[in-house]
């Protein structure tokens, strides 16, 4: 049975990509899944697609970008391109490239997101000092105009680069940690807080380690 149209408020998921993980021979029909996700997402709903790229014969595949563009072809807005930065990672001393520390978190929306509950964080001492000063903003004609200090207070809205542990400390669930493609519980929690409200319907079409369901 299919889900009804315009049914899901928020999807938070990380698909298998570029053959980096095997799922008991399960095939991954991306285009079919993308179309279905658009169909079942409510107007104003959000899809968070957490994905990276493999390196094959010396070149990154670019799969993440291809998928993002296809979601836009399906009708989604690319609301934000966020970064999941990993604190713990496996260094590759042999590769002639810098170690990969991040994955993309593409935030797609069906029209404008109906919900945004911003998460704040403490400002650094340097930021607090800067906020006490007047800010000069360059105008289109090249002149400068004093701007109001809009960034007041000791906290600020988080940026779109989120940093998490990605080892055994990222979950208290032993069964979840044994899954080959776990993402941090706090990451799922932060997206659920940001893009949904109580009693909204949260979805993960892959449900690998159950992190999204657990945090919802």
Predicted regions and their residues:
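Core catalytic lobe of class I
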Residues: 1-216
């Amino acid at each position: 049975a299919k889900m009804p149209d315009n049914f899901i408020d928020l999807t938070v998921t990380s698909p298998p990509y570029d053959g980096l993980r095997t799922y008991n021979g399960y095939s991954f029909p991306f285009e079919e899944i993308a179309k279905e996700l658009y169909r079942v997402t409510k107007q104003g709903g959000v899809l968070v697609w957490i994905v990276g790229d493999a390196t094959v014969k010396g070149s990154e595949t670019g799969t993440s970008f291809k998928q993002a563009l296809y979601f836009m072809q399906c009708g989604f807005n690319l609301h934000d391109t966020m970064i999941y930065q990993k604190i713990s990672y496996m260094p590759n001393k042999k590769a002639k490239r810098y170690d990969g520390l991040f994955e993309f978190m593409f935030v797609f929306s069906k029209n404008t997101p109906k919900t945004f509950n911003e998460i704040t964080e403490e400002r650094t001492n340097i930021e607090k000092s800067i906020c006490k000063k007047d800010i000069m903003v360059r105008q289109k004609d090249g002149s400068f105009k004093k701007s109001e200090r809009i960034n007041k207070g000791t906290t600020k809205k988080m940026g779109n680069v989120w940093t998490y542990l990605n080892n055994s400390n990222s979950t208290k669930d032993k069964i979840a940690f044994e899954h080959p493609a776990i993402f941090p519980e706090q990451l799922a929690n932060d997206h659920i807080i940001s893009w949904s409200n109580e009693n909204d319907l949260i979805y993960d079409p892959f449900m690998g380690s159950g992190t999204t369901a657990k945090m919802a």
